[in-house]
Amino acid sequence: MAVLGAKMHPRSIELASVYNVPVYVAGTFSKKKGTLITKGDDMENNKTVTGIAIDKNVSKVTIKKIKNKPGTAASILKPLSDQSISIDIIVQNIPMDGYIDFSFSVSDDDLGRVYDILMSQGNLEFEDVIQGKGFAKISLVGTGMQNAPGYATDMFNALGEENVEIEMITTSEIRITCLVKEEDVEKSVKSLHSKFELDKD
């Protein structure tokens, strides 16, 4: 039935897990092997950092001294989203005298369009748009990173030891991402590989 869309009821799997009962899912009239669901190690107990991801050809955009008011972020990002421009790292600084700086990263290919779109928004009041190419995103990838203290600090220390300047930072449950200069990518990756012993089994 699973092929036709039937699903295991979440409550049945939950009870099986609580009482450590293995669940075997198979077709009634098929001789093919089914799926055995058993209790295993928690993901958070496995090796946390599993790899490093690199994304080059990244640009940084900073809107200087934009009026801080409800809906400001949406008024900046929605016109870009409407044009299918993907935004990744987003940083908004603390308001000063009612104004903020708003920064984000985009691909190099979209940078020209971003500037034109921002300049065409009559409802946005800002002092300047600063943009630059030559950046890359380096991500520490793993499982259960949100529950593993110290990994972000270790990453930042490793980059700092190589005099790598971190431009922007973002985190999620499975990654910690830093925006750095593209020229610093090679030494950054080597340093992180060494710090987290990714070359070892």
Which residue stretches match the model-derived regions?
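C-terminal catalytic "cap/lid" subdomain
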Residues: 1-171, 175-201
